[in-house]
Amino acid sequence: MEYAEVMTELESLGKERTKKMYLSNGAVEPLFGVTTGSMKPMRKAIKINQDLAEELYASGNYDAMYFAGVIADANAMTEADYDRWMDQAYCFMLADWVVAVTLSEANIAQEVADKWIASGEELRMSAGWSTYCWLLGRLKDDKFDEDKLSAMLEQVKETIQDQPERTKHSMNNFVYTVGLSYIPLSEKALVVAEEIGELVIEREHKKPQTLNAYASIQKEIERDRIGFKRKYVRC
């Protein structure tokens, strides 16, 4: 499929209800309102196509940008490419669910994510922490440096309260994900989560959201899900 065909298909798959939901979460026009599940047939037909992904991402259409992440060749993209995509990621859904997800399948994932975490920019920091969440939820524990992750937990504990709202959300999710998916530090994550306590995240045009990583990890313990790993992160 070529660019025009994909855009026509995405438009036909759009739903007004989904569009309203995306708009309420920070997406802006142009967009069609396509659910991720509706994209799967096209994903199977196209598989991986980096050139097409670049065309779609550059369109500025939210649904096209999302689908670009689905068909992107994660390891063909350089650090500069990921930075360019982040420059265009205008909302958390693109930063955390498109760019971070794609980066998490690249060999340079941790290297790039570390720089984003240190950037001081809300969505870049959020995407950096989110990249680690996607990595931890998929890769075996021996693919990570335990000391590094331990230091990152300490960083979250000491700095989370002073971060921008979306960064705060992703840092909290990092603690939860370590607790759920990284057995060597699961107990430490629980302790850190308890020290952090409840977080109230302010959201534009929405009621504040209350997060509690400690309670969430405890629920996973009760469900005997500690050590959970997923096979895929992209739809």
Where are these regions (language model features)?
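Alpha-helical scaffold domains
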Residues: 1-235
